[in-house]
């Protein structure tokens, strides 16, 4: 269940009262983020549902696959390498696919045949300090590698495009979940490009959350902070834990992924364009769940509610009017 919202701070309410005195029409933003309690027993049965997961052979993707499978879903694991022996659920199929290859992704989706839930999870970290100078044999500045861009952004966009295309053609709706990162909200200075791309994935969710529901398709993200996977093995996570800093298990993040695909919401994150019904019960959509240690926090609703504060009241009003003018739905 989503908890009751806490009241806004006194200072914020006074600010809103001042604006009302100047005849500015506002809806009071709610000032606190939303903590979530997610348990595997709350996940509904998914018998007959088909789930495709990129980067599904290990880490967060594999953890989500096992949870989906225990709920009765049929799983297709897209990855460059198969899962370790005995780790994949029985009702799963491994499909070799490189998410940077459109041809391989198309073939993987075609082999799956039907898609109800799609999890864009494949990702890599930065291979070297991106903005440090490295030189070739002639002493010239070397072109940097773009694996982190190709896998994390291009691969996610292509995977999402294929998933949405299949869901539209099927005419039965569906759910897309993207593995973003806490660095998309709180960048790491030693991972500048990775952080920027993860911020871009959150932006992709924001950009699509008003258009996909017309096809009964939802799109959400999960933003893991430090999580024990191949990208953050235990020998690196150990010192963080020893210092008392929160570290999540892959299972905990995987549970947030599954929840994002099946949950309901009592209201939209925000309205767009000509929309005027915010308090509309519907599929969980346009949201990001931060996983930090053993805690879950939904981030997007509060950011949207507080938009007039950080974006500016006049800017928010004019931008909304621009969106409505260009909204031809």
Swiss-Prot record:
SUPFAM superfamilies: NAD(P)-binding Rossmann-fold domains (SSF51735)
Major subcellular site: membrane
Xref: Pfam families: adh_short (PF00106)
Catalytic residues in the record: 194 (proton acceptor), 198 (lowers pka of active site tyr)
Residues with glycosylation annotation: 91
Function: Short-chain dehydrogenase/reductase; part of the gene cluster that mediates the biosynthesis of PR-toxin, a bicyclic sesquiterpene belonging to the eremophilane class and acting as a mycotoxin. The first step of the pathway is catalyzed by the aristolochene synthase which performs the cyclization of trans,trans-farnesyl diphosphate (FPP) to the bicyclic sesquiterpene aristolochene. Following the formation of aristolochene, the non-oxygenated aristolochene is converted to the trioxygenated intermediate eremofortin B, via 7-epi-neopetasone.
Family to which the UniProt record says this protein belongs: Belongs to the short-chain dehydrogenases/reductases (SDR) family.
Name of the molecule in the record: Short-chain dehydrogenase/reductase prx4
């Amino acid at each position: 269940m989503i908890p009751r919202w806490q009241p806004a701070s006194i200072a914020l309410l006074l600010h809103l009262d001042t604006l009302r005195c100047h005849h500015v029409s506002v809806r009071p933003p709610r000032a606190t983020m939303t903590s979530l309690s997610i348990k595997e027993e709350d996940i509904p049965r998914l018998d007959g549902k088909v789930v495709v997961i990129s980067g599904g052979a290990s880490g967060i993707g594999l953890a989500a696959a096992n949870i989906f499978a225990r709920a009765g879903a049929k799983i297709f694991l897209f990855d460059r390498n198969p899962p370790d022996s005995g780790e994949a659920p029985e009702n799963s199929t491994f499909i070799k696919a490189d998410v940077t290859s459109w041809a391989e992704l198309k073939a993987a989706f075609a082999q799956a045949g039907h898609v109800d839930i799609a999890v864009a999870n494949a990702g890599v970290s930065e291979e070297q300090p991106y903005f440090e100078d490295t030189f070739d044999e002639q002493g010239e500045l070397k072109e940097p590698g773009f694996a982190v861009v190709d896998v994390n952004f291009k691969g996610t966009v292509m995977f999402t495009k294929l998933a949405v295309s299949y869901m539209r053609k099927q005419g039965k709706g569906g759910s897309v979940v993207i593995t973003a990162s806490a660095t998309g909200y709180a960048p790491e200075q030693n991972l500048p490009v990775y952080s920027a791309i993860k911020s871009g994935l959150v932006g992709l969710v924001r950009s699509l959350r008003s258009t996909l529901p017309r096809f009964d398709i939802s799109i959400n993200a999960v933003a893991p902070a430090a999580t024990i996977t191949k990208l953050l093995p235990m020998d690196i996570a150990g010192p963080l834990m020893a210092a008392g800093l929160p570290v999540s298990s892959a299972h905990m993040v995987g549970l947030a992924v599954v929840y994002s695909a099946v949950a309901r919401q009592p209201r939209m994150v925000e309205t767009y364009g000509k929309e005027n019904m915010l308090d509309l019960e519907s599929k969980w959509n346009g949201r990001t769940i931060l996983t930090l240690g053993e805690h879950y926090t939904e981030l997007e609703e509060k950011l949207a509610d507080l938009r007039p504060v950080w974006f500016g009241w006049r800017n928010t009003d004019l931008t909304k009017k621009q969106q409505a003018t260009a909204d031809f739905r």
